[in-house]
């Protein structure tokens, strides 16, 4: 069955499973790097608590680099696919070339930040000299050798634009495997490799990213024959760059909001480094669970968008219903695992002094997974039905407008000794529940104005 026929004729529930599983696995792999690093670092013989705190502080910048790379790739993907659909091979070559030019610019910015800005960034979140040293060492390596993650993100989208997403998945798997193998060797010093501690974790991460990028570069050059390759196509074209970011900028903003939220939460929790570490570790577990919802969202959006294009009210309604049902199932599974096994996760990270805070955060914040997953599904539905503004509003509510003021206010009571740190964790479920209510109102409005009017 041709791809367009599948989108048109295959039962929506079956189509969503078929499209969603690879995307869910792909998103889950993206979360593996950070969890693996933290697990091995948490089991260091000396300084593990400080090292985990350092990884918590550097995480927002890591997410921001990924956000810019993926956002640029998203814009490239959509523009390249459209251009190829129009049969314009010359412009397609320029689109691909300009995306690589943008990758070079992004890398130079990351490199300069790695050399000149890392220390000021880390010191804004901690006064602990050991944490500062570890954080600077780790983040400097990640920024200076960031070309791996940047170009992996671009080549991944170039392959997806030509229908070769299988090869990008291979690249992700290879990078994750390389990272997992190198982490204990470089962190603990196994064989001829010296013990490098937290810097070893950074080197293992970037080597895995470079391995993925190199492999995808080879796939791109050998498989993407629909357009020409060459340095001449990297000459910047203002019109093409504008088109790329007209599509990709919203994706960058949405991802960047996550970085801002984590950074500000680190500042709010600065008065208690153990709670700060616990939040950073839990966020990586939370990210892994929510990435399941993100992967399913990436299936929900094209299915509903295709149905909207063919003006099929039934397939749109089936897409909304099945998307929400499958998301709820995944999130209930995530809640069950995190509520039942918080001690197992604490042991995995060898949390030490932050163990109590970590378990408390997991038991409270994981309640929000159900509502957070529904919000993510809502955003996929909005985007499919031309509801970009509604999607952005939900992102702002979840990651900026509600959560940060609420956590800040709660932290005042905690610092004054009036109540325990758990009050701050309750800001997350409250935020997701309120956002979910607003999201439901948006969904009713969109269904009334854009779906129910269809024949």
Regions found by a protein language model. Name each.
Residues 1-20, 80-147, 193-248, 304-368, ...:
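Short alpha-helical transmembrane segments in multi-pass integral membrane proteins
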Residues 28, 32-53, 122-129, 185-196, ...:
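Helix-terminus/linker motif at the lipid-water interface of multi-pass membrane proteins
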Residues 7-47, 60-75, 79, 104-111, ...:
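N-terminal transmembrane alpha-helices
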Residues 49-60, 135, 139, 202, ...:
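Small-residue hotspots at the loop-to-helix junctions and early N-terminal turns
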Residues 18-37, 141, 175, 208-212, ...:
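Transmembrane helical elements of multi-pass membrane transporters/channels
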Residues 52-112, 149-168, 278-342, 372-386, ...:
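Small-residue-rich hydrophobic transmembrane alpha-helices
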């Amino acid at each position: 069955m041709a791809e367009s026929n599948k989108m048109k004729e295959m039962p929506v529930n079956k189509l969503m499973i078929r499209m969603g599983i690879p995307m869910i696995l792909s998103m889950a792999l993206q979360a593996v790097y950070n969890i693996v690093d933290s697990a091995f670092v948490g089991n260091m013989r000396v300084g593990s608590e400080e090292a985990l705190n350092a990884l918590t502080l550097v995480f927002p910048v890591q997410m921001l680099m990924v956000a810019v790379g993926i956002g640029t790739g998203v814009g490239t993907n959509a523009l390249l696919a459209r251009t190829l659909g129009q049969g314009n091979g010359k412009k397609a070559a320029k689109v691909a070339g300009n995306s690589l030019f943008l990758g070079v610019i992004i890398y130079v910015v990351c490199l300069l930040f790695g050399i000149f800005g890392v220390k000021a960034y880390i010191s804004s979140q901690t006064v602990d000299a050991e944490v500062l040293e570890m954080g600077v060492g780790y983040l400097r390596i990640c920024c200076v050798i960031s070309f791996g993650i940047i170009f992996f993100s671009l080549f991944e989208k170039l392959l997806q634009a030509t229908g070769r997403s299988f090869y990008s998945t291979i690249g992700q798997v290879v990078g994750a495997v390389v990272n997992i193998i190198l982490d204990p060797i470089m962190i603990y010093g196994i064989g001829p490799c010296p013990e490098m501690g937290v810097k070893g974790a950074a080197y293992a991460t970037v080597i895995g990213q470079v391995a993925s990028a190199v492999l995808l570069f080879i796939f791109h050059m050998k498989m993407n024959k629909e357009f020409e390759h060459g340095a001449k196509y990297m000459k910047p074209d203002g019109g093409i760059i504008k088109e790329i970011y007209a599509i990709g900028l919203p994706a960058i903003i949405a991802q960047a909001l996550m970085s801002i939220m984590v950074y500000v939460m680190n500042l709010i929790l600065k008065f208690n480094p153990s709670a700060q570490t616990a939040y950073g570790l839990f966020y990586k577990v939370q990210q892994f669970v929510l990435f399941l919802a993100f992967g399913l969202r990436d299936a929900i959006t094209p299915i509903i968008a295709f149905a909207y294009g063919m003006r099929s009210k039934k397939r749109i309604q089936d897409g909304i219903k099945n998307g929400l049902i499958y998301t709820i199932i995944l999130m209930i599974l995530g809640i069950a695992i995190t509520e039942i096994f918080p001690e197992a996760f604490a042991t995995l990270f060898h949390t030490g002094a932050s163990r109590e805070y970590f378990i408390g955060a997991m038991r409270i914040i994981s309640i929000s997974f159900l509502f957070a997953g529904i919000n993510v599904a809502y955003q996929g539905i909005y985007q499919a039905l031309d509801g970009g503004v509604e999607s952005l509003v939900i992102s702002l509510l979840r990651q900026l407008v509600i959560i940060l003021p609420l956590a800040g206010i709660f932290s005042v009571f905690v610092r004054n000794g009036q109540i325990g740190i758990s009050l701050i964790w309750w800001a997350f479920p409250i935020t997701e529940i309120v956002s979910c209510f607003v999201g439901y109102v948006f969904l009713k409005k969109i269904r009334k104005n854009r779906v129910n009017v269809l024949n």
